[in-house]
Amino acid sequence: MKKTDTLPTTLSALIQEYSIAEGIQMAEQQVRENPAKALCRHSLFQLLCVAGDWSRALHQLQLCARMEANYTQEARLYRELVRCEMFRHTVFQGEQRPGFLLPQPVWVESLLAALACHDDTGEVDKHRNTALEAITDTGGQWNGGAFDWASDSDSRLGPVLELVTGGVYIWLPFSQIRSLESPQPTRLTDLLWKPVNITLVNGDTHGAWLFTRYSGSESASDALRLCRETAWQDGPGETTVRALGQKVWLTSHGDISLLDMAHCTFHAQENDGA
């Protein structure tokens, strides 16, 4: 291990100086030295989440809740987020379907059909092209800048927001969103899931959690796991672009990082695409 074996005072400082693996080793050492200190276990929990070691992460958080009652609600929340993260993976494998808040536009079914085709490139492209032909652009504004259209940089999603609300993994088309409000990240787990308040085109409001990191990033490099960059891989087929790392939307006026997004409005109609 490089530099010093003393754990930095904040996780932010730790991940600037050490690899995730080194950080986990140091946090584990702190837990061994202070087994009854919930804060040490909470630091280990956050690092294990970044590494995608879901079962160990939840175990540490459950121990925190047993030690200090103020962790009980957080333990319940992150059990839901981790469960939805694992379910999310099966959706991208074409094995499960996401939930929806409103009746989905017909093109969403084409995106899901493309996922179910796996590596049959002809069918993947056929279904995704069908979706692309049916999608209508949704403009809006974010953090003070305007755009005429927006889409996730991972083509498997297109103009769809991934989120968790009510313990369910949701796909929400941009055309069904009126506004998003999300604070700046303050903790390590915000690199995976960030709180957001959503207003839909029908006026309904939801407290939810955005996915700020792409599915599968837990197995990538530290730079991608920590959302310091985004990487893309083409294929299978001509229409597939898979992303890892920090979640990014492409727009007509530049890219939007979901980590940096504080406020976004969409110029959508209630019946768009349905």
Which residues make up each language-model segment?
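Short coil turns that delineate tetratricopeptide repeat
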Residues: 35, 69-70
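TPR alpha-solenoid repeat register
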Residues: 40, 74-75
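Inward-facing hydrophobic residues that define packing positions of alpha-helical scaffold repeats
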Residues: 27, 61, 128-129
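Residue at a conserved register position within TPR or TPR-like alpha-solenoid repeats
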Residues: 14, 48, 82-83, 117-118
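Structural register within alpha-helical repeat arrays
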Residues: 10, 43-44, 79, 106, ...
